[in-house]
Regions:
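C-terminal peripheral helix-coil segments that are non-catalytic and often amphipathic
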Residues: 67, 71, 103-111, 129, ...
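Residues in the helix-turn-helix
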Residues: 10, 24
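Short coil/turn segments at alpha/beta junctions that flank glycine-rich nucleotide-binding fingerprints
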Residues: 3-7, 72, 111
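Helical hydrophobic small-molecule/effector-binding pocket
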Residues: 59-92, 127-138
Length: 168
């Protein structure tokens, strides 16, 4: 699914890779779409909970997401397929993964530690900045094989840019 999307994914290839059979796959997930939804849900939960979220350190969280995107480019590809094939507009993921983060941003805003504005828009901006060098980038997709100095340079730029964007 990560290389061909939901439409291009073939059940025979999926069951061979998972070492299962069609009856088990359909019995558990109901359909190929159900499997795709379960995979997206699992991968989204993993990446968004990979590091601690601190609304007072959105720059640090963004750098953590940059590193997660390097370690797990498959999630970014799955999200791109989801956007292309099933949800061309609006919220991409399940809101339940965002609620606690948005509440934390709202509290930080009320305390004057994060700039005013719609918490969801700020959250989306930080996510987009963290994905600037991900496989979803239209300009450049970074890989773990690149020199660490390149990643350090990007991390520093990302940290500073997010800090400037969210500081009141």
């Amino acid at each position: 699914m990560r290389s061909n999307g939901i439409a291009g994914a073939r059940i025979d290839r999926i069951i061979a890779a998972a070492q299962t059979n069609k009856a088990q796959l359909y019995g558990y997930f109901g359909s190929k779409d159900g499997l795709f939804d379960a995979v997206i849900d699992d991968r989204t939960a993993r990446i968004l909970s990979a590091g601690p979220f601190d609304a007072d350190d959105l720059p640090g969280w963004a750098v953590g997401l940059y590193d997660e995107n390097l370690r797990h480019p498959d999630l970014v590809r799955l999200m791109a397929w989801l956007r292309l094939e099933r949800r061309p507009a609006g919220r991409l993921g399940d809101q339940r993964y965002d609620d606690a983060k948005l509440s934390a941003i709202t509290r930080a805003q009320a305390a004057g530690r994060v700039r005013a504005g719609d918490p969801f828009d700020l959250f989306v901006l930080v996510l987009a900045m963290a994905m600037a060098w991900s496989p979803a980038s239209g300009s450049y997709a970074a890989t773990p094989e690149e020199p660490e100095a390149d990643h350090d340079r990007r991390r520093a730029l990302l940290h500073d840019s997010v800090r400037r964007a969210v500081t009141p």
